[in-house]
C-alpha cells in the first residue's frame, strides 16, 4: 500500500477551499444571459466551446491532490443537480461556493462546524418550502416556450421548438436531441408507436416511390416465436382475406417457406400483407410485444399463455388505423386499444422506472413509456460548424430538461430573484449562536446567483440587489438582457422551481460536508527511482581507427 499524506484542520480546509474556488470560478462565468463561454481543450479535434456548467465542471482536474478533492466534491454538486433536474448546474456551483466560503470563515472564527451545518440545513428546508409555496403552475404553451428560451440563453427559436414538441407528444413523450446534417435546426414528430424494425422483404412495399409499405385500417398479428411455416396460420389468414383488410405480422422472425408464401400472395394481390421482426431482445422483446398488444387491442400469441397459432381468431388480432413500414422503422398510428388498459400499462412502466437502479434500463423503460403515451419528437440541432452544433446542443439539452422540470413543479421569478426574496423570509431560529450563524450563512449565500448574474453582465451587483429588495412585489426583478426592471414572470424571465430547489439542496449538502471536514488523506506522489548507470564500454576497443 502506498504511503499517504495527511493534512489536518485549517491547512486541509484552505487547500480544499482553493480547489472549490478554482472550479467555481471557471463555472460561474457562464451564468446568466450575458454569461461568457468557456473553451475546453480536447485531446483530438477542435476545442469545445460551452456555456453548460456541468460540462465545464467535469473537465476540471487539479494537480494538487488536496485541492483536487475540494474541486471534485463541488463537481458532485453540479453532476447531481444535472442528474435530478437536468439544468441549474451553474447556479448549484455558485451556491456551493458561497456556502463553503462563508462556512470556512465561521469555522476559522472558532465556531462549531456541526452546529453550523445544522443551522444551514434548517434554513435550506425553510427556503425550499417557501419556493414550493410561491411556485406558479405552467398551463400554456407560451409559458413552456419562455422557460425553454431562458435556459437556452435567450434563444427564442429553441424555446418555441421545445414547446411545440411537448404539445405534440405530451409531457410524458420522449423528446430527443440530435445533431443535424444541415445548418438549420428542425423538429420532427413521430406520432403513434415507432420501433426500429423494417419490412422483411421489399416486395411488401406499397409505395415504390418512397419505398414504404402503408397499411390502412390493418389487423396486427403478434407472435413471440419464429414463423417458418404458415400451415397453422391458414385459418386466420383466410378470415382476414374475407374482411379485405390488410394484415401486419410482427414475430421474432418470418423466414423460409412462410416468407415466400406471404410474398407470393402479396404479389398476386390476394392478400394485403407485410411482416416485420419484433423489436428488442429477450425479456424486453416480450414486454414490447405486450405494449403493442395493449396499444392495438390485440393479444400476443404465446405458447406460455397456452395460445396456439391454429386457434387464433380475428378478435385476438390488434387493430390500427394506419401502419407505415419503411426499410428501417415501423410506425403504428391510432391503435384500437382501450384507454383504461393503456393508462394502466403506463402506470406500471412508471413504477418500474422508479424502482430500477440501472440507467440503461431506465432509458429503455422511458422509451417504452413514450411510445405508449403519445409519440416521439426529435429536435435536430444545426449549425455552421461542428463546434457550434455541439455548443448549441448543450443549450437545447438544458432547455429541454428545464422545461420538463417546470411542467413538473411550476416556476418562480428567474434571474436568482426567487432565492433573493427567500433570503429575507427566513425566520428559523437556531438553539445556539453557532446554529444562528449557519442560518445567516444561507441568508447571505442564496443572494450569490443574482449577484453573479449581474456581475457577469458588467453591472454593480450591490446596487441592483438593493433596488430589487426595496420593492415588495414577489416577481419584481432586473432583466439583465436589456438592463430594465420589471415584473419578471410577465417578461418571461422564469426559473423552474425544481431546478432552483435541487441546486440549493445539493449545494448545501456538499458544502455542509466540506465545512465539517477536519482531516484529508491523499496518496503521496511516487518518487522516481534514479536511472541505472550506463554500462561500461567494451574492453579492448581503445586505439581502434575508424
From Swiss-Prot:
Superkingdom as given in the UniProt entry: Bacteria
Binding, ATP: 30-33, 51, 87-91, 415, 495
Main location group: cytoplasm
A Pfam entry, by short name: Cpn60_TCP1
Matching SUPFAM superfamilies: GroEL apical domain-like, GroEL equatorial domain-like, GroEL-intermediate domain like
GO CC annotations, alphabetized: cytoplasm
Keywords of the record: ATP-binding, Chaperone, Cytoplasm, Isomerase, Nucleotide-binding
Entry's localization field: Cytoplasm
CDD domains per UniProt: GroEL
EC number: 5.6.1.7
Matches recorded under InterPro entries: Chaperonin_Cpn60_CS (IPR018370), Cpn60/GroEL (IPR001844), Cpn60/GroEL/TCP-1 (IPR002423), GroEL-like_apical_dom_sf (IPR027409), GROEL-like_equatorial_sf (IPR027413), TCP-1-like_intermed_sf (IPR027410)
GO biological process: protein refolding
Enzyme class label: isomerase
Keyword Chaperone in record: yes
Reactions catalysed: ATP + H2O + a folded polypeptide = ADP + phosphate + an unfolded polypeptide
GO molecular function: ATP binding; ATP-dependent protein folding chaperone; isomerase activity; unfolded protein binding
Subunit comment: Forms a cylinder of 14 subunits composed of two heptameric rings stacked back-to-back. Interacts with the co-chaperonin GroES.
Family as reported in the entry's similarity comment: Belongs to the chaperonin (HSP60) family.
NCBIfam families in alphabetical order: GroEL, PRK00013.1, PRK12849.1, PRK12850.1, PRK12851.1
Purpose of the protein: Together with its co-chaperonin GroES, plays an essential role in assisting protein folding. The GroEL-GroES system forms a nano-cage that allows encapsulation of the non-native substrate proteins and provides a physical environment optimized to promote and accelerate protein folding.
Name the UniProt record assigns to this protein: Chaperonin GroEL
UniProt source species: Brucella abortus (strain S19)
Amino acid at each position: 500500500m502506498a504511503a499517504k499524506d495527511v493534512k489536518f484542520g485549517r491547512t486541509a480546509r484552505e487547500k480544499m477551499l482553493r480547489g472549490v474556488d478554482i472550479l467555481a470560478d471557471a463555472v460561474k462565468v457562464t451564468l446568466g444571459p450575458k454569461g461568457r463561454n468557456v473553451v475546453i481543450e480536447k485531446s483530438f479535434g477542435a476545442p469545445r466551446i460551452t456555456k453548460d456548467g456541468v460540462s465545464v465542471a467535469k473537465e476540471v482536474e487539479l494537480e494538487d491532490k488536496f485541492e483536487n478533492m475540494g474541486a471534485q466534491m463541488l463537481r458532485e454538486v453540479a453532476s447531481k443537480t444535472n442528474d435530478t433536474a437536468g439544468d441549474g448546474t451553474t447556479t448549484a456551483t455558485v451556491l456551493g461556493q458561497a456556502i463553503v466560503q462563508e462556512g470556512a470563515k465561521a469555522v476559522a472564527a472558532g465556531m462549531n462546524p456541526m452546529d453550523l451545518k445544522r443551522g444551514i440545513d434548517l434554513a435550506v428546508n425553510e427556503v425550499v418550502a417557501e419556493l414550493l409555496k410561491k411556485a406558479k403552475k405552467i398551463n400554456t404553451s407560451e409559458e413552456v416556450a419562455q422557460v425553454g428560451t431562458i435556459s437556452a440563453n435567450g434563444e427564442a427559436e429553441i424555446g418555441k421548438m421545445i414547446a411545440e414538441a411537448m404539445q405534440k407528444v405530451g409531457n410524458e413523450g420522449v423528446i430527443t436531441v440530435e445533431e443535424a446534417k444541415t445548418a438549420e435546426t428542425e423538429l420532427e414528430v413521430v406520432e403513434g408507436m415507432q420501433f426500429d424494425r423494417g419490412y422483411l422483404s421489399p416486395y411488401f412495399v406499397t409505395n415504390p416511390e418512397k419505398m414504404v409499405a402503408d397499411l390502412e385500417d390493418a389487423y396486427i398479428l403478434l407472435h413471440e416465436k419464429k414463423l417458418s411455416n404458415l400451415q397453422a396460420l391458414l385459418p386466420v389468414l383466410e378470415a382476414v382475406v374475407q374482411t379485405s383488410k390488410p394484415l401486419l405480422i410482427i414475430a421474432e422472425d418470418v423466414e423460409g417457406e412462410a416468407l415466400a408464401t406471404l410474398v407470393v400472395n402479396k404479389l398476386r394481390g390476394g392478400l394485403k400483407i407485410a411482416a416485420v421482426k419484433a423489436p428488442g431482445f429477450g425479456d424486453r422483446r416480450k414486454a414490447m410485444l405486450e405494449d403493442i398488444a395493449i396499444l392495438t387491442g390485440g393479444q400476443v400469441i404465446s405458447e406460455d399463455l397456452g395460445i396456439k397459432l391454429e386457434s387464433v381468431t380475428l378478435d385476438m388480432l390488434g387493430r390500427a388505423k394506419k401502419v407505415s413500414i419503411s426499410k428501417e422503422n415501423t410506425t403504428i398510428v391510432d391503435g384500437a386499444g382501450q384507454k383504461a388498459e393503456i393508462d394502466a400499462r403506463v402506470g406500471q412502466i412508471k413504477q418500474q422506472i422508479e424502482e430500477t437502479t440501472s440507467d440503461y434500463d431506465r432509458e429503455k423503460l422511458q422509451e417504452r413509456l413514450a411510445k405508449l403515451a403519445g409519440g416521439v419528437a426529435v429536435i435536430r440541432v444545426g449549425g455552421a460548424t461542428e463546434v457550434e452544433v455541439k455548443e448549441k446542443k448543450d443549450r437545447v439539452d438544458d432547455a429541454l430538461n428545464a422545461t420538463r422540470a417546470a411542467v413538473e413543479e411550476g416556476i418562480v421569478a428567474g434571474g436568482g430573484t426567487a432565492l433573493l426574496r427567500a433570503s429575507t423570509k427566513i425566520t428559523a431560529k437556531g438553539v445556539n449562536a453557532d446554529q444562528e450563524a449557519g442560518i445567516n450563512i444561507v441568508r447571505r449565500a442564496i443572494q450569490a446567483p443574482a449577484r453573479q448574474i449581474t456581475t457577469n453582465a458588467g453591472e454593480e451587483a450591490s446596487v441592483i440587489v438593493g433596488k430589487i429588495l426595496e420593492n415588495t412585489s414577489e416577481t419584481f426583478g432586473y432583466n439583465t438582457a436589456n438592463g430594465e426592471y420589471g415584473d419578471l414572470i410577465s417578461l418571461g424571465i422564469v426559473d423552474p422551481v425544481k431546478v432552483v430547489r435541487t441546486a440549493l439542496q445539493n449545494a448545501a449538502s456538499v458544502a455542509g460536508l466540506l465545512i465539517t471536514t477536519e482531516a484529508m488523506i491523499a496518496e503521496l506522489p511516487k518518487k522516481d527511482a534514479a536511472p541505472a548507470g550506463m554500462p561500461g564500454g567494451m574492453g579492448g576497443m581503445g586505439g581502434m581507427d575508424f
